[in-house]
Amino acid sequence: MSKYIHPITVKAALEVASNLLPADYREVTEGHGADPFKYLLLEAAKAECVYFSSPGGRTAGMAGVEEDGRIWMLCTDVIKNHPTKFAREAKRYVDSREEKLLWNVVDKRNKVHLKLLKFLGFKFLREINFGPNQLPFIEFCRVRRSSRC
C-alpha cells in the first residue's frame, strides 16, 4: 500500500497508546469510557488494523475499520512533524477501503481530527451527545462513489 502504512503490530499499538495526542486520549477515555491500552491492544488483534509511520520511522498513529464500516484513527504527536505527509497517507488509506459506507463519531473538541476528516472527504451529519459522559460528538460519514454507471 505505502511505505508509511503497515500491518499493525503489538509494539506499534503500545507506542500509540503510550503517546496519544491529548485530544485523542481525552476522546478515548472521556468520550468512550475506554482505557487506551486495552482498546488498542484489542484492536491490534484484528487483521484490519494498520499503523502509520513517519519518514523517520516513528509511529504516527493507528487506524482500522470495523465490519460495519465504522472507521477510526488515533494519533501521536509525530503527526505534527509531518502533517502534510500524514494527511496524504491517511487519504491513501481511506481511499483504499472498499466499504461503500465509512462512518463514526468524533469528539467535537478534537479539532485535529475534525480538520483531517474534512480533508479526507467525510461529511459531518449531526451533533449528538455520546458515551458515558454524554459529551458532544459529531457523526460523520463518507459514501464510496461507484465506478460503474
Regions found by a protein language model. Give the residues of each.
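A structural microfeature
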Residues: 61, 126-129
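A short helix-loop-beta-strand connector motif used in the catalytic cores of GNAT acetyltransferases and
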Residues: 39-52, 60-61, 98, 135
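Conserved beta-strand in the GNAT
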Residues: 55-70
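Short amphipathic alpha-helix that is part of the acyltransferase structural core
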Residues: 1-34
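A short, internal acetyl-CoA/4′-phosphopantetheine-binding micro-motif in the GNAT/acyltransferase core
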Residues: 72-88
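Conserved acyl-CoA
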Residues: 88-102, 111, 120
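Conserved beta-strand-loop-alpha-helix junction that forms the acyl-donor binding cleft
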Residues: 103-118, 129-132
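C-terminal "cap" of GNAT-fold acetyltransferases
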Residues: 130-149
